[in-house]
Amino acid sequence: MTTLSPEAFAGHTPMMQQYLRIKADHPDTLVFYRMGDFYELFFEDAEKAARLLDLTLTQRGASAGTPIKMAGVPHHAVEQYLAKLVKMGESVAICEQIGDPATSKGPVERKVVRVVTPGTLTDAALLSDKNDVYLLAMCTGHNKRGVAVNIGLAWLNLASGALRLAEIEPDQLAAALERIRPAEILTPDGATDAIPAGAGASKRVPAWHFDIASGTQRLCDQLDVASLDGFGAHSLTSACGAAGALLLYAAATQGQQLRHVRSLKVENETEYIGLDPATRRNLELTETLRGTESPTLYSLLDTCCTTMGSRLLRHWLHHPPRASVAAQSRQQAIGALLDAPANASLDALRSALRQIADVERITGRLALLSARPRDLSSLRDTFAALPALRERISAIVANADALARVDAALAPPAECLDLLTSAIAPEPAAMVRDGGVIARGYDAELDELRDISENCGQFLIDLEARERARTGIANLRVEYNKVHGFYIEVTRGQTDKVPDDYRRRQTLKNAERYITPELKTFEDKALSAQERALARERALYDSVLQALLPFIPECQRVASALAELDLLAAFAERARALDWVAPTFTDEIGIEIEQGRHPVVEAQVEQFIANDCRFGTERKLLLITGPNMGGKSTFMRQTALIALMAYVGSYVPAKSACFGPIDRIFTRIGAADDLAGGRSTFMVEMTEAAAILNDATPQSLVLMDEIGRGTSTFDGLALAWAIARHLLAHNACYTLFATHYFELTQLPAEFPQAANVHLSAVEHGHGIVFLHAVNEGPANQSYGLQVAQLAGVPAPVIRAARKHLAYLEQQSASQHTPQLDLFSAPPAAVDDLECADAPALPDTPHPALEKLRDIDPDDLKPREALDLLYELRTLVRSHDADGHA
């Protein structure tokens, strides 16, 4: 909004002056200004909101000679409008009336009580049940020459209070943001760091908010510690600067302290198996390549009974630990749950978990004093159910350390439960303003006021009986409505019997309504009691919220344990329902999967063909050939998914599986243009390949699918050959290398650590049947024309392709420099790889092939065909005897 001069400001009405002062403090935020039962927006805010929310744009008179553009939303429906705006990346300042209109001189006092931004959501109506919302701040660290040396990250889940720090290399920013998926990113004013497209809504804040010394002190104050040494964060200067800005911003949006942010976790990139953005996308962990939520690994695994468990599952899938100890502990717990006795059966446990509330988010709202009555009743009911839940798992905790730890953490906070039980009504109203929230017996004054209000009915019945007897009016009625209060109604024909102390209150067509001194006295007392009861209830509710604040750490402890128990039980249910097994781990290099299955694809088809996959020190690269649609990509992805599931702690879809150390998983599968980044399909492909070649280690799992297909045949083949050799000779990583360049199948002759496998298929007439079985050795052809036919390519095109294929094969056979000569040893100055020799095809075609080309089968008689067959056999034997391959 344009800054107004003092003269222009003075020309506005007092109410608009109040609005403009508030708006000046929130220039980049939509201000929802409370006026009665509506939140109003003015000037540019009104125009923007009308456009985004499809509201009617009106005018409200004029101020300073200018028409006031205005749009509004009803206060009772504000959450649905906030949800829409937040999804669009907008922020909204909620300005409430905090003064009393009856006593205010001039405009009622108003104040911004909170600011709703994409990264600071806590209201249940604004949050997705199964997705965490993160606010992230980033601060770049520079050396003395001003060169960026690292980026400090701090991110906060305000709904739960979870705060994390990390410092990364500048080139790792895209991968980190893909992993964290922040909803809002804070950066310093004037910063030149480019935020990747689609990473989240960005917000510029003053650069001084990122001051390292201030940030470190603010972080210590927040955690109530003297230093950050105990968290391992003392040396993360850039991250501490980011944390300072983060905490300052979050507290400002809430208008209060962040009481539930009391712990800190420092993340180290070596703690988790590395998954770059391409890998997370290609493996479809939580989102398909089409951008849908299902079918994905997450959608398959998420049978959690609580939303806390579902959110933890998403976190675990994106953060698989490198150390197998965590996975083994989780799998031990799954085994214990599967083997539990009848009184602690998995089904009974999951049935109990379905009654559990979202303790994590309720605790967050409690800490911010925004918990609603039904939040507290849900918290009470959950805590009351904990003893029975613990009893169900007590029989099996001895068999699993993880379950023993969960059991100990599920001890209900007794004092907290006592307070909730005594203070909150069994079934409270949704809002405090509706009354009926505080339990009877908790406060004597409130009970007395309620008795006065609730005993109105009996008083009116008694009064009606007395007045009928006193007046002789048999149809006299004593009633109440919100407009006229209490009254005595007498029909027209009986008004002559009305006593002198009746005072007319309302005249109707067929009746008169009166008030008496006795009824007026009771009315004042009853209505006053209702108002005072609501005010008392509001004060009591606020005091209960304050009294619950000391229990926040215990509530967080219980929430964490419930989420883990629920997720482990969901893993156990999946293992039982889908016939999965517990993997094993070894310190030796290698991957052994027997009869592995793609978990997601298997759930979509009637029958899935299981396949083995084996890697070791003597077998590091599998060259995978076979037809399109034959299952090469599925086989590659299933290997990576089974490995990831094993390290996450789940059972896996296989007959057996054993894994050595895995530090990263890379995928180079498919590609599309990066139009925004100005990169072609081939450039995207080569960029991903370069990252793999530069970063893969002997403990990395690499998936390479048809590398080199985005350029000319010879260029693509040369690159594929060189990349495969580099992965073998230098990276020595586990590699699944799918290709249609059959020339590459000769690599195992040069590198014993490479092996050929193929996806089998059989021809049926001009069609093809895919067997989806992985067999040793190379494929003999690609069946491209048959696949095209299956895809519905018109028959004339297929016939023309067959004819041209025959021509190309004839041309290739007669070439003196066949394509396979790429594998001949190049000059030493050009190729820095050792042992670059590879066998070449023979220069002259086989004489039997020459003979076959000259034959027209349709012109042969049966006897001639038989004679020709013997002649061809003689040619083959003669050719082999001369020493030809």
Swiss-Prot record:
SUPFAM superfamilies: DNA repair protein MutS, domain I (SSF55271), DNA repair protein MutS, domain II (SSF53150), DNA repair protein MutS, domain III (SSF48334), P-loop containing nucleoside triphosphate hydrolases (SSF52540). GO terms for molecular function: ATP binding; ATP-dependent DNA damage sensor activity; damaged DNA binding; mismatched DNA binding. CDD domains: ABC_MutS1. The keyword 4Fe-4S does not apply. InterPro entries: DNA_mismatch_repair_MutS, DNA_mismatch_repair_MutS-lik_N, DNA_mismatch_repair_MutS/MSH, DNA_mismatch_repair_MutS_C, DNA_mismatch_repair_MutS_clamp, DNA_mismatch_repair_MutS_core, DNA_mismatch_repair_MutS_N, DNA_mismatch_repair_MutS_sf. ATP binds at residues 626-633. Keywords: ATP-binding, DNA damage, DNA repair, DNA-binding, Nucleotide-binding. The keyword DNA-binding applies. GO terms for biological process: mismatch repair. It comes from the Bacteria. SMART domains: MUTSac, MUTSd. GO terms for cellular component: cytosol. This protein is involved in the repair of mismatches in DNA. It is possible that it carries out the mismatch recognition step. This protein has a weak ATPase activity. Belongs to the DNA mismatch repair MutS family. NCBIfam families: mutS1, PRK05399.1. This is DNA mismatch repair protein MutS. It comes from Burkholderia orbicola (strain MC0-3). The lineage of its organism: Bacteria, Pseudomonadati, Pseudomonadota, Betaproteobacteria, Burkholderiales.
